[in-house]
A protein has these predicted regions:
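Nucleic-acid endo/exonuclease domains
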Residues: 1-128
């Protein structure tokens, strides 16, 4: 990421939660869907079908959030709310704990993981 480009940094930070879920899912051989609305008719930020697990970092309109929670419950999907607070490292550590809560154990160097995610984003950004 170009130093000082606030737009690039903002875009990276807004995408980081979904990129991190995707990265850790891949690490465990799990397929993840990003922004898919095929299940509920409203988009889930990230969804791991084999685990029936949805992880969301942001929040939309309160009514949409209530509806999502209800629809996930009806379909037996565990919905974890994990807001992006603090640094990417904080989020990645909290995400690993969230995965652990559903018996998905990830042992890796979190700082290294964050660097890999950032580099992946930069390569994608440069290719656009």
């Amino acid at each position: 990421m170009k130093k000082g480009c606030r737009i690039c940094v903002q875009e990276y930070l807004s995408l980081f939660p979904a990129l991190a879920v995707s990265y850790y899912s891949n690490k465990k051989g799990l397929k993840s869907e990003l922004g898919s609305d095929r299940l509920l008719g409203v988009p889930l930020e990230t969804y791991i079908p084999s685990e029936k697990l949805a992880i969301e970092s942001g929040s939309a309109d309160e009514n949409i959030e209530i509806m999502k929670a209800y629809m996930c419950k009806q379909r037996g999907i565990r919905l974890i709310k994990l807001p992006m607070k603090g640094t990417e490292l904080d989020y990645a550590n909290n995400l690993k704990k969230a995965f652990q809560s559903v018996h998905i154990f990830i042992s890796s160097d979190t700082e290294e993981d964050v660097e890999i995610i950032k580099n992946t984003f930069e390569r994608w950004r440069d290719s656009q």
